[in-house]
């Protein structure tokens, strides 16, 4: 009996915690779909295509291809 009551209290607490810490989801889908549609029309607008902290062509990279934006490294980014 005590275990059942504790389980009920735990589930209620976790449910309340989920609602309290969740982002404001009002109009979430309404704002999500136009943004996704824009990225489908213009793939360059996608945030996934952007690499931050990479070196452009002509920069020294040693032998680490991950440092170059093009991921082609022969001592210098190509």
Curated annotation (Swiss-Prot):
Keywords annotated in UniProt: Cleavage on pair of basic residues, Disulfide bond, Hydroxylation, Ion channel impairing toxin, Knottin, Neurotoxin, Presynaptic neurotoxin, Secreted, Signal, Toxin, Voltage-gated sodium channel impairing toxin
Modified residues annotated as 4-hydroxyproline in this record: 65
Segments passing through the bilayer: none
InterPro entries cross-referenced by the UniProt entry: Conotoxin, Conotoxin_d-typ_CS
Intrachain disulfide bonds: 54-69, 61-73, 68-77
Keyword field contains DNA-binding: no
Location in the cell: Secreted
GO molecular function per UniProt: sodium channel inhibitor activity; toxin activity
Residue ranges the record assigns to the propeptide: 23-49
Pfam families: Conotoxin
Annotated Gene Ontology cellular component terms: extracellular region; host cell presynaptic membrane
Tissue specificity: Expressed by the venom duct.
Signal sequence, start to end: 1-22
UniProt superkingdom: Eukaryota
Function, in words: Delta-conotoxins bind to site 6 of voltage-gated sodium channels (Nav) and inhibit the inactivation process.
Family, per entry: Belongs to the conotoxin O1 superfamily.
Comment field on protein domains: The presence of a 'disulfide through disulfide knot' structurally defines this protein as a knottin. The cysteine framework is VI/VII (C-C-CC-C-C).
Name by which UniProt lists this protein: Delta-conotoxin-like CVIE
Species of origin: Conus catus (Cat cone)
């Amino acid at each position: 009996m005590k275990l059942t009551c504790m389980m009920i209290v735990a589930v209620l607490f976790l449910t309340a915690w989920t609602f309290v810490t969740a982002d404001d989801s009002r109009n979430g889908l309404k704002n999500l779909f136009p943004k996704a549609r824009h990225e489908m029309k213009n793939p360059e607008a996608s945030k996934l295509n952007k690499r931050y902290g990479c070196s452009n062509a002509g920069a020294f990279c040693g032998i680490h291809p991950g440092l170059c934006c093009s991921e082609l490294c022969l001592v210098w980014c190509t």
